[in-house]
């Protein structure tokens, strides 16, 4: 799965090892893979389905935590804009596809957009939004202060922070579906929200 965001995520660990030990050999495999993906972007549609190849793109919310911090860090480490340009392009396309501009939350994937909860609310998966929210600081922290796209990620984080705050229930927890307070409590989300 060369393109799958989950399989690029492991690069975050290699990048941290490189930063700690200053050994470029630790970066080589992740850099080669990320460079290949960025220089040969998938032509698959940005629609997650059960069909083969639909996870080659960042077509589900979790992917925005998995791969972008790797590309941001590789851009900063190498100075090669191919990493930044690829990250920005894929990220923005995913946001344009899955981010609800009214609620400032993400649908898990395009199949969820028309779905509604029992209370009639839009279906925003708590864990997926937690992944996105926790990933944004990793992207921002990995970009140089003068990077032109940094403000895009900061703005998105700020919008989401307010939306996430509003969805927190009286018991201090979030729900599996963020706009349905009667859905199951989701303690897993606490870690993501705290990290963000």
What feature does the model see in each segment?
Residues 1, 28-48, 81-107, 154-172:
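Long, well-ordered core segments of solenoidal/helical folds
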Residues 1-17:
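Blade-loop segments of beta-propeller domains
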Residues 47-53, 109-122, 176-183:
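Acidic/His metal-coordination segments adjacent to aromatic residues that form catalytic metal sites
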Residues 187-196:
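Conserved small/polar residues in nucleotide/adenosyl-binding loops
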Residues 133-178:
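Oxyanion-binding "anion nests"
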Residues 84-137:
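Loop-centered beta-sheet repeat module
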